[in-house]
């Protein structure tokens, strides 16, 4: 079956769409980033898709704005690919694209899909997506709590102040502290409801260095990698997905830069893995000590 690629540049309010099949390319307009807009896109695609092609959506991850659209695409049984924005930018430069507009970006995504034929991705399991949201909310609460505690520490060193300001900071600390306990209890209860996640957490926790602070983030990351590669990924690809693959820069004998990591993946997971490795190195019986030495 032939494939009809849809390149979509998605923003908070709307998105631009371009179709590409064989040698035919067509911009089909701008649509609202909401269920009505998704339906209007479907109507426009159906008018073009007279040969009953397989639909393959190509879009860049844009915070959370793309999530509703991607869920809709899976409901329509479309194939979906979410290439790394850095990869798309570099690919576009290689194609000689010098202009950046929403319409050009949609054109680039459709052309990338048509020429590179990226593998379709699976959707992330709903219960993993919900766990991920709770983990992110916990991080947000911890950040707000830390900020308020820093404000309190700064406040007590002031020579002047007000009782209202002091009490407001104390109230905020109490509020965020209670919220943190609540979301932690919710995560614990959620894992009891989903024994598959609980068992996988136990297995990951057996790896030296992976503790309670990072194990669930790493578990979600592995699920996301599995979905991104349709369960066909390998170890090298996983390392690259985290942005830990080596970035070499040398040419003959005249050009050489110290190798670094690419940092093209999720910076949060790199921080989590770094802290896990650091913790693993501190344990006397950890095999990481012998490995690194």
Identify the role of each PLM range.
Residues 12, 63, 87, 220:
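Short, glycine/acidic-enriched loop or turn micro-motifs at the edges of active sites
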Residues 24-52, 56:
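Nucleic-acid-processing active sites and adjacent nucleic-acid-binding tracks
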Residues 58-68:
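Acidic, metal-coordinating catalytic cores used for nucleic-acid/nucleotide bond scission
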Residues 81-205:
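Long, charge-rich intrinsically disordered scaffolds of nucleic-acid metabolism proteins
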């Amino acid at each position: 079956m032939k494939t009809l690629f849809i390149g979509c540049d998605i923003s908070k309010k709307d998105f631009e769409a371009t179709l590409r099949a064989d040698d035919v390319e067509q911009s089909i307009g701008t649509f609202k980033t909401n269920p009505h807009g998704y339906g209007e896109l479907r109507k426009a695609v159906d008018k073009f898709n007279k040969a009953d092609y397989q639909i393959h959506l190509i879009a860049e991850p844009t915070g959370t704005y793309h999530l509703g659209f991607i869920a809709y695409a899976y409901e329509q049984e479309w194939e979906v690919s979410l290439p790394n924005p850095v990869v798309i930018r570099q690919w576009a430069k290689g194609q000689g694209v010098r202009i950046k507009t929403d319409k050009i970006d949609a054109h680039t995504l459709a052309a990338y899909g048509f020429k590179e034929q990226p593998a379709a991705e699976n959707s992330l399991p709903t219960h993993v997506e919900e766990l991920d949201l709770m983990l992110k909310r916990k991080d947000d609460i911890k950040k707000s709590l830390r900020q308020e505690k820093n404000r309190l520490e700064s406040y007590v060193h002031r020579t002047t102040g007000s009782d209202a300001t002091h009490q407001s900071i104390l109230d905020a600390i109490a509020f965020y502290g209670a919220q943190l306990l609540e979301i932690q209890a919710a995560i614990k209860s959620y894992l009891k409801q989903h024994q598959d996640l609980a068992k996988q957490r136990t297995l990951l926790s057996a790896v030296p260095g992976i503790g309670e602070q990072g194990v669930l983030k790493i578990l979600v990351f592995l699920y996301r990698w599995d979905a991104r590669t349709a369960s066909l990924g390998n170890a090298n690809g996983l390392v690259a997905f985290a942005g830990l693959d080596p970035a070499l820069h040398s040419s003959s004998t005249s050009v050489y830069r110290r190798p670094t990591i690419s940092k093209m993946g999720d910076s949060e997971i790199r921080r989590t893995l770094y802290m896990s490795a650091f913790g693993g190195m501190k344990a006397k019986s950890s095999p990481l000590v012998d490995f690194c030495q």
